[in-house]
Amino acid sequence: MITSIATSMAVRIAEKRAGKFGSGVYSGRAGQLVERNFLAFKSSNWLVVISGFVEPVFYLLAFGLGIGKLIGGVTDGSGHTVSYAQYIVPALLATSAMNGAIYDSTWNVFFKMHFGKIYQAMLATSLGSLDVALGEIGWALLRGLTYSIGFMLVVAPMGLIPSWWGLLAIPGATLIAFGFASVGMGMTSFMKNFHQMDWINFFMLPMFLFSGTFYPISVFPEWIQWIIRALPLNQAVELIRGLTLGNLNLAMAGHALYFVVMIAAGLFFTTKRLTALFMS
């Protein structure tokens, strides 16, 4: 009797794992993983989230309202002069989306993959590798979005979002978080130990400092500017800055497309890696 029940369950799981795209890749249950992460998150330390929220606020107070008093106005990419605080706010908003998404899609994923052995258990159910990828990336996206919304609620009443187009900064931050989370999880799937994880921070810090976050990239030689423009955070900063300052142009469509490509590439490689690691 028990053998019959177990066999029947195995058959049903195998059928579900065939999924909508075949080969056990997708069963349409990514939302269950997001729900699982939320339930686990409710019992975790909220200080982690609070620290991610207050970090950009501290940068704003120190640089925007502190050093900004000494600097005065800054000329943006369209030739308009804005206050220094208004100049760095969209960059800090984009950085918040990036940091929240990267944290969950790298360190948390690394622990689940190599120590918690959670993905092995998940992929033994009806979940497919794309379900896991979408679920984890979706959760990381929500974290990045939460940071961005919290920061917007702080800076908007201060008059640091001069354009009504700034309302679209939240959907923009969602796109940014989705892109970073997708690539972050894909990169993490190749990491074998904590020492290799340090390479992520090694890349993130200079990108944060030199991507037009605190000053225009025009201060650099032309060849360095081209390198910076290729960085995802610079694309994010330019997208959000254009929205919050009301400087809309065709280049913003290119910035958005950049993250669409990031999302597609990240999902593809993450799904491939999870399939190769745990389902082959």
Question: How would you describe each model-predicted region?
Answer:
Residues M1-L167, P171-S280:
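Hydrophobic transmembrane alpha-helices and immediately adjacent juxtamembrane helices
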